[in-house]
Amino acid sequence: MNNATFNYTNVNPISHIRGSVIITICVSFTVILTVFGYIAKIFTKNNCTNNDIGLRERIKCSGCEPFCNKRDDISSPRTGVDIPSFILPGLNLSESTPN
């Protein structure tokens, strides 16, 4: 059984540089979008309303909330991880199951 040998002297440097440039552009684009998202969130922080958990009253964002919804919806504040219902179809959080 022969061991596989790799010869790295035949690697095309142009394709390696091209791949590195593409990865750098993608990462830079993601970072720029993230920065612009935070800037937009800072500018719109004082104008949005958020609904408290279990209450339908409108409260002003205090600045401590990680996400602030601008729409007038009845969803809870975006402070945790949302679990879609199709991932855990048998989970019922409101009732306990008997032994």
Swiss-Prot record:
Glycosylation sites: 3, 7
Membrane topology recorded in Swiss-Prot or TrEMBL: Single-pass type III membrane protein
InterPro entries in alphabetical order: InfluenzaB_glycoprotein_NB
Membrane side Virion surface: residue ranges: 1-18
Pfam families, alphabetized: NB
Self-association state and partner proteins as the record states: Dimer.
Listed name of the protein: Glycoprotein NB
Source organism of the structure: Influenza B virus (strain B/Leningrad/179/1986)
